[in-house]
């Protein structure tokens, strides 16, 4: 069974003077493979570590890190997951080994019931 948990909800709030306060959502997907979707900002490190510990997981238990795009509130703690496969935007890599995949043509299947699809958004 695949379970999706929001470890930290994201937000966008007008702050006045042409500024906003914003931070991305951090999501854990547990199944036959464990995924983190977006690793937040660097100041979210403690939230990630505490949340994983609470769930009985460590950083080494995460098989995939999926980052929806390269903004700092989505990739700020990627370095915690040294053993994971990274899917960042349209790149799939483990260390310096890249897997070629055309997301515009088909989903990337991580495990049964878990696929990654392209969803162009505010960075497209």
Describe each model-derived feature in a short phrase.
Residues 35-38, 86-88, 114-116:
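Short hydrophobic-aromatic micro-motifs
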Residues 11, 41, 123:
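Short, glycine/serine-rich, charged loops/turns that create anion-binding
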Residues 29, 38, 62, 69, ...:
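Divalent metal-coordination and catalytic microenvironments
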Residues 101-123:
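A mid-sequence, solvent-exposed acidic-amphipathic segment
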Residues 17, 23, 40-109:
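Active-site HxH/HxHxD metal-binding segment of metal-dependent hydrolases
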Residues 5-7, 66, 87, 117:
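Hydrophobic/aromatic beta-strand patches that form the interior of the parallel beta-sheet core
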Residues 8-10, 90, 120:
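Residues at the C-termini of beta-strands that transition into short coil/loop
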Residues 1-32, 107-108, 112:
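Zn-dependent metallo-beta-lactamase
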């Amino acid at each position: 069974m695949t379970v999706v948990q929001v470890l930290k909800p994201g937000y966008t709030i007008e702050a006045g003077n042409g500024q906003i306060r914003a931070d991305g959502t951090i999501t854990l997907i547990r199944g036959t493979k464990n995924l983190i979707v977006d690793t937040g900002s660097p100041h979210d490190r403690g939230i990630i570590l505490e949340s994983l510990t609470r769930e009985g997981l460590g950083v080494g238990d995460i098989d995939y890190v999926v980052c929806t795009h390269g903004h700092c509130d989505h990739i700020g703690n990627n370095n915690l997951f040294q053993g994971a496969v990274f899917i960042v935007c349209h790149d799939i890599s483990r260390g310096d080994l890249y897997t070629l995949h055309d997301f515009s043509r088909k989903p990337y299947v991580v495990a049964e019931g878990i696929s990654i699809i392209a969803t162009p958004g505010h960075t497209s």
